[in-house]
Amino acid sequence: MGSASPGLSNVSPGCLLLFPDVAPRTGTEKAASGAMGPEKQEWSPSPPATPEQGLSAFYLSYFNMYPDDSSWVAKVPEARAGEDHPEEPEQCPVIDSQASGSTLDEHSLEQVQSMVVGEVLKDIETACKLLNITADPGDWSPGNVQKWLLWTEHQYRLPPAGKAFQELGGKELCAMSEEQFRQRAPLGGDVLHAHLDIWKSAAWMKERTSPGTLHYCASTSEEGWTDGEVDSSCSGQPIHLWQFLKELLLKPHSYGRFIRWLNKEKGIFKIEDSAQVARLWGVRKNRPAMNYDKLSRSIRQYYKKGIIRKPDISQRLVYQFVHPV
């Protein structure tokens, strides 16, 4: 993607904190706020200079988007014109707690999860158009990172934190832990980290459903592995756990804190965060109840199949692919 918008980091707070739905405070409120003292003043967003200007139009003009990227914004007035007669919202599936067994509950949970994921993907697509950035945080330039930070701060009413992440590109940002986010941004760092994880997961899901070059799809260990990322679809075949683990290992900038190579040539890897790896596997298989106990049992099944084994020097959560990458 392109470089940062000119002067993004030097914009005054009055320009950064624009919320069309936040009304300006009265003189009485300002006086009351001043009486609190500098230590007790709460951070509050400023209203836009032109209240009639929509947030979408503001971002397009501020970030100087390309004309062809902004054509979809013309539909906004039409949508507002129909606000007097809103359509009936879709109803979430009802989970029947009296149903026998857990099959119905799991099915309902999967439906809810699919609906939520769909809405998240739509929101991310909209943000990408507004900010002119890619959906994969690992590909962001330092300027793209600043745009995303500004957007997230506006969306979730967070105090500005752009200066704390200056000069960081997408790969560096994705490699940071939640604690590192908190150190750089004590107020809101955990929220930023959580939403970055959502963006990474969304990019991962979008990538695995898009067509790509053919990679290793064999279900046994009789063939060698190819370099590059695994095509999870494998011509319609369900993804196997060992393929999923390889996907994570091939994206160290996104998942290096969860799973990493100890010796790539020998195929030895370590699961650093078993709970997170299990959670990601549950998302991939659409199984919200997935945990590491279930995942580890699946890994042990590969011992007999000759796909994964324990290395010569056995260590906890350390495994070895029989046929190295």
UniProtKB/Swiss-Prot annotation:
Xref: Pfam families: Ets, SAM_PNT
Record keywords, A-Z: Activator, DNA-binding, Nucleus, Transcription, Transcription regulation
Lineage: superkingdom: Eukaryota
Principal subcellular localization: nucleus
Gene Ontology cellular component terms for the protein in this record: nucleus
Alphabetized PANTHER family for the sequence: ETS, SAM POINTED DOMAIN-CONTAINING ETS TRANSCRIPTION FACTOR
Family as reported in the entry's similarity comment: Belongs to the ETS family.
Subunit structure: Interacts with the DNA-binding domain of the androgen receptor. Interacts with NKX3-1.
Protein name: SAM pointed domain-containing Ets transcription factor
